[in-house]
Amino acid sequence: MPKYKDINKVLVIGSGPIIIGQAAEFDYSGTQACKSLKEEGVQVVLVNNNPATIMTDTDIADIVYIENPTVSVVEKIIAKERPEGILATLGGQTGLNLAVKLKEEGILDKYNVKLLGTSFESIKTAEDRELFKRKMQEIGEPVAESVTVTNIEDALKFAKNYGYPLIIRPAYTLGGTGGGIAHNDEELISIVDLGLKKSMVGEVLVEKSLYGWKEIEFEVMRDAADNCITICSMENFDPVGVHTGDSIVVAPTQTLSDYEYQMLRSASIKIIKALKIEGGCNIQFALDPKSHKYYVIEVNPRVSRSSALASKATGYPIAKIAAKIAIGLRLDEIKNPVTGKTTAFFEPALDYVVTKIPRWPFDKFYTTDRKIGTQMKATGEVMAIERSFEASLLKAVRSLEIKAYGLRLNNVKAMKTEEILKGISVPNDMRLFYIAEALRRDIDIDYINEVTKIDKWFLNKLLNIVNMEREVEKSELSEGILKKAKRMGFSDREIATIKGIKEEDVRMLRKQHGIYPSYKMVDTCAAEFESVTQYIYSTYGEEDEVEIHDMPKVIVIGSGPIRIGQGIEFDYCSVKALWALREAGIKSIIINNNPETVSTDFDTGDRLYFEPITLEDVLNIYEKEKPLGVMVMFGGQTAINLTEGLVKNRVKILGTSYESIDISEDREKFSKLLRELNINQPKGDYALTVEDAKDIALKLGFPLLIRPSYVIGGQSMEKVNTLQEIIDYVSNATQVSPGRPILIDKYIDGREVEVDAVSDGECVLIPGIMEHIERAGVHSGDSFSIYPARNLSEREINTIIEYTERISKALNVKGLINIQFAVKEGTVYVLEVNPRASRTVPIMSKATGVPMVKLAVEVALGKKLKELGYKSGLWPQTPYTVVKAPVFSMEKLTDAEVSLGPEMKSTGEIMGIDLSYEGALYKALEGAGLKIPKKGKILLSIAERDFQEVPSLVEKLQSLGYEIYATYRTGKYLSLMGIHVNVISLDNAIKLLKDGYFDAVINTPTKGKKPDNTGFKLRRTAVEYRIPLFTSMDTIKAALNAVAKVNVNGLSILSINEYEEIQKDNVKNLVL
């Protein structure tokens, strides 16, 4: 029983939407914590506004509030629910910052709520740069020379005394937001100015740079009885100066001597004890490669990205144990769930090497600066487990899904040596491949080490890989060479490319020689005790530890790393699928490689293969397990793209067939199907060459929408207005999906509508219709969406239902399908179809109460919807409103274009739910950082094509009492219309934005994309200084309606459980 007898109900704070620096790792840790507390008989109340997470499902916490985690909202929840404790160390920086505010504003004391786990004082000491420095000095732990400043003058004074380079770290921020490395006064002024604005308390730390030192991390655990253990040591491949979230990380540490390891381990334990942290904590060190000198960089007094990595690397469930410690249990009282025999009071032992590689969004942002530094830019990451560093690294590279199957890339191979050397000289997303190419060209390791400061041990391992490439190239693929290459982690595809043969030839040859992977268990104790959980990785040339049982089982293919266009929503679907299979009495197997997610938790499925999602790796597991079949509909485009190869290798696909998937994914075949079904579609044609595209453009007229086949998140999808733009974009898009046609559509300036449905081939259930606020042309993932749809006539709704049924039956869909429509002047057009789970499945499941994934799994296994209690057609709509709002991470990506278009840019989403439409929209806007104050100054800079909409907008703003400023061209147009506003230059507008003069910016781009355009700079400044920015006229109009009509005090604060009850009463009358 927990030590704290008085803690029966706990409020857990979630981390909110997925943004760079705070991703799915907090869904994983939060889910684990909620389950862990419930195991101890504690009632769990959760607040989190991210609908795409597993943790916001009502079967994880007892009571779930999908509300914005603000002080006022959380106070209302505390007043209503009266929890005895609050757990904030599992909600990332969001949770931590909120807990600090609740404590400082006296709310926790007012309601007698105990801050569980790490105390307020410990959080303050670890997060406040000056207090932390003092505490380290007090216990004799070295910290770099630094000063905490609240103004630019003090920063410049420090620079004068200590020289450059300097590292700037704002207090209470995440992912290095607002930080950077300054090499001169100008850079220092710019970074400090921004950092002060980003910090919750308006202070930044300026410290002497330790650039080039080794960065080492320790994950440590402590309980209230002062018992301490280190769970995992991790080494950054990149030296200090690159944010750990943007660095390749290896566990356990590889290049430390035993003396260095013990020195840093002892320091870690000393630090966690001094800070009195109860639970998990991450400590980062800088170690001088030339001596035993080290400095403490920082401490995260909470579960972090590194904790998720350490959990998956060791099998030790950090968040689960941390939650139990928070309610008073000691480490020696908690059972280790992996072995089932030992307690949690032990240090995991690893007999393998783990490598994490970040996944960056540069494929979506062509203009952004690809350099990496102290401010994180990666959206996600992959992890690989193998017996050697070389094999682990190569496995991680092929998990990234960047068309790299080893360290050889054609575009890098084609570069001149001076370009390669330039690429090595600064940290960037491609540096690993540049280094490998430099080694191929016999560039000296000492030189590479001198330039990159990457340890020679790692560089020599890369050289081993390069030498193996040479050996494969020169040899006849003998059994010996193949075995050696496979043991080093080479994929069949990489070997085939080096030899100029087909991948299937290598696979056949390998099988002829009897070379198969063997599978090993992750057991936390280097096989000292038998593992009761099924957490597996592959290797070559070793004994296989995994027994195959003869029971019915199904493989679910996961969605890999989080990236723009394929986020946590697909992990939600994978997890729900695993649970549905278990409920159906079928063993569930998941293949995935993302260390941040719930799907890769050791007990989510019956068996977890932590492997790359490539044809080779999936086929190996399929052949070993011999399941009933494979489910590809939950793993996003990652899984869908494997279908063709799986079917060719006689793998049974459960659910919609490959033929149907191919029809809907291939633009030309799909267009033909719609014509046969007599369904409206935008006028269009397909092109394979630039010449085709030019002819089509001239025939259809502008504006046009270009879409490639088989891509995610609208990658390379563009709205084009001129012939030159079409020539530029077709050249780019052809590279995205080789050999697949590009569809060129006439752009429809209408409302966009979206439907997710479940079909069994005969019966088609539509849980709801979502309507987008922004017109067609803005990617659905970047649109505000409303459920139930508000502006559709009965005739339009009936057409949408009819089209959904016709398409689902024609494609014989067995499972989930997502269809996007445009509606203009009463005509409904079909824009696209995805015969799989979409990113709106989680939110629609939560909004309507229809268990979409569970139904899709049952249908894929052969059941009919009627047997499951559902009928064809539209499910009764809810008497409340749900609004999905996109959330962007633009402030982290220098030089990225922020305006909306057909290519997706958002990293996450939040949900606003309320009994009124205006209330739900207001909550969604606030959660997305677009809250407009009731009064204030608004800046307008509008593109000419939108001028006709400006007068009514300005009149609305003025009637609400806003003071309006406009840039020259917009102001001049308004003046001609007889409307008077304050007119300023763009340059002056940017200066005033930096000074915090404006409360919101409305700017629709003219050209966009070019960082030297003034409009581009205006949008970037608004984003970087966190001023609400609207780049779509539709969004701002909807926002103003919400602001005008909403009574903030009248917003309903109900749990999802209460909304579900309202909907159950609503559906009760439905006769099936």
From Swiss-Prot:
Q: Which GO terms describe its biological process?
A: 'de novo' UMP biosynthetic process; glutamine metabolic process; L-arginine biosynthetic process
Residues binding Mg(2+) 3: 820, 832
SUPFAM superfamilies the record matches: Carbamoyl phosphate synthetase, large subunit connection domain, Glutathione synthetase ATP-binding domain-like, Methylglyoxal synthase-like, PreATP-grasp domain
Positions binding ATP 2 in this chain are 707, 746, 748, 752, 777-780, 820, 832
**In the UniProt entry, what is the domain comment?**
The large subunit is composed of 2 ATP-grasp domains that are involved in binding the 2 ATP molecules needed for carbamoyl phosphate synthesis. The N-terminal ATP-grasp domain (referred to as the carboxyphosphate synthetic component) catalyzes the ATP-dependent phosphorylation of hydrogencarbonate to carboxyphosphate and the subsequent nucleophilic attack by ammonia to form a carbamate intermediate.
Annotated Mg(2+) 1 binding lies at: 284, 298
Q: Which domain of life is it from?
A: Bacteria
Q: Please report the organism this UniProt entry assigns to the protein.
A: Thermoanaerobacter pseudethanolicus (strain ATCC 33223 / 39E)
Positions of the region Carbamoyl phosphate synthetic domain? Answer: 545-929
- The UniProt annotation places Mg(2+) 2 binding at 298, 300
Q: Which residues does Mn(2+) 2 bind?
A: 298, 300
Question: For the region Carboxyphosphate synthetic domain, what residue ranges are annotated?
Answer: 1-401
Q: How is the cofactor bound?
A: Binds 4 Mg(2+) or Mn(2+) ions per subunit.
What is this protein's gene name? carB
Q: What is this protein called?
A: Carbamoyl phosphate synthase large chain
User: Which residues are Mn(2+) 3-binding?
Assistant: 820, 832
- Which keywords accompany this UniProt record? Amino-acid biosynthesis, Arginine biosynthesis, ATP-binding, Ligase, Magnesium, Manganese, Metal-binding, Nucleotide-binding, Pyrimidine biosynthesis, Repeat
* Residues that hold Mg(2+) 4 according to the record: 832, 834
Where is the MGS-like domain positioned along the sequence? Answer: 930-1072
Q: Which cysteines are joined by disulfide bonds?
A: none
EC numbers, comma separated: 6.3.4.16, 6.3.5.5
